[in-house]
Amino acid sequence: MAFSVVLHPAFLLAVLSLRASRSEVLEEPLPLTPEIHKVSFQLKLQEVNLEWTVPALTHEELNMIFQIEISRLNISNTIWVENYSTTVKREEAVRWNWTSDIPLECVKHFIRIRALVDDTKSLPQSSWGNWSSWKEVNAKVSVEPDKSLIFPKDKVLEEGSNVTICLMYGQNVYNVSCKLQDEPIHGEQLDSHVSLLKLNNVVFLSDTGTNINCQATKGPKRIFGTVLFVSKVLEEPKNVSCETRDFKTLDCSWEPGVDTTLTWRKQRFQNYTLCESFSKRCEVSNYRNSYTWQITEGSQEMYNFTLTAENQLRKRSVNINFNLTHRVHPKAPQDVTLKIIGATKANMTWKVHSHGNNYTLLCQVKLQYGEVIHEHNVSVHMSANYLFSDLDPDTKYKAFVRCASANHFWKWSDWTQKEFSTPETAPSQALDVWRQVWSENGRRIVTLFWKPLLKSQANGKIISYNIVVENEAKPTESEHYCVWAPALSTNLSLDLQPYKIRITTNNSMGASPESLMVLSNDSGHEEVKEKTIKGIKDAFNISWEPVSGDTMGYVVDWCAHSQDQRCDLQWKNLGPNTTSTTITSDDFKPGVRYNFRIFERSVEHKARLVEKQRGYTQELAPLVNPKVEIPYSTPNSFVLRWPDYDSDFQAGFIKGYLVYVKSKEMQCNQPWERTLLPDNSVLCKYDINGSETKTLTVENLQPESLYEFFVTPYTSAGPGPNETFTKVTTPDARSHMLLQIILPMTLCVLLSIIVCYWKSQWVKEKCYPDIPNPYKSSILSLIKSKKNPHLIMNVKDCIPDVLEVINKAEGSKTQCVGSGKLHIEDVPTKPPIVPTEKDSSGPVPCIFFENFTYDQSAFDSGSHGLIPGPLKDTAHQLGLLAPPNKFQNVLKNDYMKPLVESPTEETSLIYVSQLASPMCGDKDTLATEPPVPVHGSEYKRQMVVPGSLASPSLKEDNSLTSTVLLGQGEQ
C-alpha cells in the first residue's frame, strides 16, 4: 500500500517530464528556406536586383535575417557575404540590390540566400535555415577574335571614389597596355582574355572627362578606350538663411558649394528643394542659391525648412527653423530731407515702411566728414527727425540713416544717404606765428612764418594774410602788407628800432583775431652758448634752464643745418612752466645736423634767445674726404694741409682726422701707430684729435724717397670713405741746400733789376746820358773829389790859346771839309801859331777834347757844323784847325769869353751828329764829291795836354779834328 503510494507520484512525474520534452521538440519552428524568383541587373549602374519569397510562412509578418552570398566565376569563389534584416510579409516578395565593383559584362556571378527568424512572435531559431539554390547572373558579352572591348562605358563617379575597368579581348589579341590621359596604368589578369584595371581615389581633372586609351602590342593594333566622368563631391548647402522685409514673402538664401556639373549632359547642376514640415509644402528652386517663399497671411509664425541638394550621385540636406518676427530685415528709409540752420546746425527728417503702430524700429543716424564718423540711435514708428549740431562752417557732410527691428534685432536695412554743406564764417582762431631775424647792411631782415589754420578754425577758404608793422618810437605811423594765400611766410626789411607786428588772416566772411609779435632792438644779435645734444631715432630731447620767472612761455624752433640762412623753419610753442620737451618729426633724417634755438616769450610778447643746441638723430661716417695739398716739403719732411674742408657740414660731428702714410721702410715713430688695412697692407697712422687742426708735418723721412698718404675724417660712427693714396717724393738734400742759396740770390738780383728798371732814367742820366754834359756829369764830380782838381776840366781855369772859328761870310763860298782833306784855301801856308815863352811863364795845362759834338762858335750868327773824322795822329802832332789870321780875328772880336761868365754859354754849345754828312752850300760840290761815310767819334775821357804838345804840325793827310787849346789864364 505504501509502496503504491510512493510509486504512483514518481510515475506521474516521469510521464509529465516526457510530455514536456516532446512538446518542446514539436513547438520549435521548422527552418524556412527562401526561394529566389527573379535576378535582374542594370548594366549602366552595375547593379544586380534580387527578388525572393519565404514559403510556408506561418505569420502574416515576421522579422527575419537573410544571409546573401555572391560568388564570381564559379560558386566556390565567394566574393561577397551580407546579412540583410527586413520584415517579411506573407505572399510578398523581398527585394535587394547589390552594386558590383566589376562590370557585369565581363564575368558571371552566382547568388544564393538562407534565412533566420528574428521575431518575438515566434520561437527563436537557433541556426540558419537551408540555402536556396544558386542563381546565375550572366551579363557577359561575347568578343570576336580580333576585337577588344572595355567596360564600363562613360562611367560617372565622384572624385575620390574607386573604379575597376574591365578589358575583354578576342583570342587573337595579346598584351594590351592602357594609359590614363598620358600616364600608363597596369592591370591584373582575370582569365586568359579578361583584364582588370583598378583605379583608386580618382581625381577631378576636367568637367569634360578623363580619357583611358588602350592598345594591343600583338594582334590588331586598334586603339580603344573609355571616358571617366569624374564629378566634384556634392556639398551640403551652407549659411542657409530666411528673412522677411514686408511679412509677405520669405527670402531664403544659401551658399551652394562647388558646382558638380559635367559636360555632355552626363550630370546637370545639382537641384535644390525647400520643404516646410508644418505646412507639408515642398518647392523646387529655379536658382542655385535662393528661393522666395510666399507667406500665407495669418497662417503661422514658426517655420521648419529642410533644404536638399541632389545630383545624379548623391543627396545632401540641411535644416533650419525660426520665428518669423525674429527674421525681419526692414527696407531702407525713404523721403530723407535736410534743412541747414546757420553755419553749425542741420535738421534731418525721414520715413520708414510701416509695419503697424505696435511695431517699433531702431534707426541709426550717421554723420561723416572725411574719415570722422558720428553715430546716433533713434526709435521710430512711422517717421523721425534728428538735429545735427556743432558742425564746422564751410564743410561738406554726408548724412546716413538705416533701421532695424527694435524688439528682435536681425539685420540693419540698407543706408539712405544725403549730402549737404555748411556756409562760411569768419576765422575763429589767431594764427600761430614766428619769425627769423638776421642782419644785413645795417638793417634787419625779418622773415615771418605762420602755420595754416585748421579747417575747423579757418571756417572758410583763406584769401589773404594782413600784416601791420608799427614802429614803437612812432606809434602813429604804421605800414600795411598783404600776403595772398596760400603763402605761409614773407620777408620784411626793418631798421634797428623796436617794432610791433600784428598779423591776421581773412576769408570771405571776415578776419581772424590778431597775433602780436614784438621785435626789440637786439633781436637777431643775441649771443648765447651753444651745446651739443644727441638725438634718438626720430626725435630730440630738448631741455634748458629758465632765465627769468616773468615769462609767457617758450618757443623752440629748428631747421636743418645749411649754408643758407633761409631754411624750412619749424617751431613749437610751450607753456611757461616747461623746461624740456621732445621734438619729433617725420622729416628728421640720419646724417643731417639740426640746429635748435630756445626763446623765452615775455608778457610784452618779446622773444629773447635763451640757448642754442645742435645735434643729429643718428651720426653717420663722413661722406667726403678733404682735398689735401702739400705746400712745402724738405728732404726729411713734408707738410699736409686741407684748409678748405668744412667740418660743419658733414654727416656727423668731426672728432678728428686719421692720417695714413706708407712707404717701403714702414718704420713708424712715435706718436705714429703701426696698423693694418683690410688688404693686410702695413702703414703708419696718426690720429689728429680735434676738427680745427687741419695741418700736419710728417717728419723723420728719408731724402729722395717715395711716400703715400691718405687723410680721412672720422665721427662717432666711424671714418670716412676709403680712397686711393696720394704719392709724394721727398727732394734731394744737396739740391735742397743749393735751392736755399740760389733762391735768395735770385730774389736779390730780381729786386736789383726791378729797382734799376724803376730808376733807369736816373741811372742813364747819371752814368751814360744820350748827350753827355760835362757840367752835369756826376762822374766828373766823383773824380774831382778824389784827384787833383788841376787834372779835372774846369772851364774857368782854362785859357784857350788857340781857337778855330769857322765863319760863313755872306757871298763867299762855303767852306767844306772832305774826309781827311782840306780845300786849297784852307790849307795853312804858315806854321801854326804856337804860344812862346814870352806869352807864358811856363807850360800851360790845357783841356783836350776829342769829341767834336760841341762848337763854341754858337756865338757867331753864321753857325755851321764841323765834320768830325778819326783822329789818327797823336796829341803832339795835332795843330789848329783855323789859320792864324782867323784866330787873330777871333781874338780881336772877343769871340772868346770866359765860359763861366754867362749861364747861356753852357747852353750855347751846338751838338753836331758825329755821323753827320758834310755841310756844303754848293750843290755842285755835293754832286761831284759825294759824302764819304765817316767813323763816328766818341766822347772820350778828357786829359791834360802838356805845353810842349800845344803846337804840333798839321799834316795834309791827317783827318780833321776839332781841337781847342785853352790857355790857363783865359777867363
From Swiss-Prot:
Residues 949-971 are annotated as: Disordered. The keyword Cell membrane does not apply. It comes from the Eukaryota. A motif (Box 1 motif) lies at residues 767-775. Widely expressed. Expressed at highest levels in the lung, heart, thymus and spleen. Expressed in dorsal root ganglia. Disulfide bonds join C242-C252. It is found in: Membrane. Keywords: Disulfide bond, Glycoprotein, Membrane, Receptor, Repeat, Signal, Transmembrane, Transmembrane helix. Residues 759-971 are cytoplasmic. Residues 959-971 have a biased composition (Polar residues). The keyword Ion transport does not apply. Residues 24-737 are extracellular. Induction: Up-regulated by IL31 in dorsal root ganglia. GO terms for cellular component: external side of plasma membrane; plasma membrane. Residues 332-425, 427-523, 524-620, 622-733 form the Fibronectin type-III domain. A motif (WSXWS motif) lies at residues 412-416. It holds the Pfam family LIFR_D2. GO terms for molecular function: cytokine binding; oncostatin-M receptor activity. Glycans are attached at N74, N97, N130, N162, N239, N271, N304, N323, N377, N491, N541, N577, N689, N722. Associates with IL31RA to form the IL31 receptor. Binds IL31 to activate STAT3 and possibly STAT1 and STAT5. Capable of transducing OSM-specific signaling events. Belongs to the type I cytokine receptor family. Type 2 subfamily. Heterodimer composed of OSMR and IL6ST (type II OSM receptor). Heterodimer with IL31RA to form the IL31 receptor. This is Oncostatin-M-specific receptor subunit beta. The lineage of its organism: Eukaryota, Metazoa, Chordata, Craniata, Vertebrata.
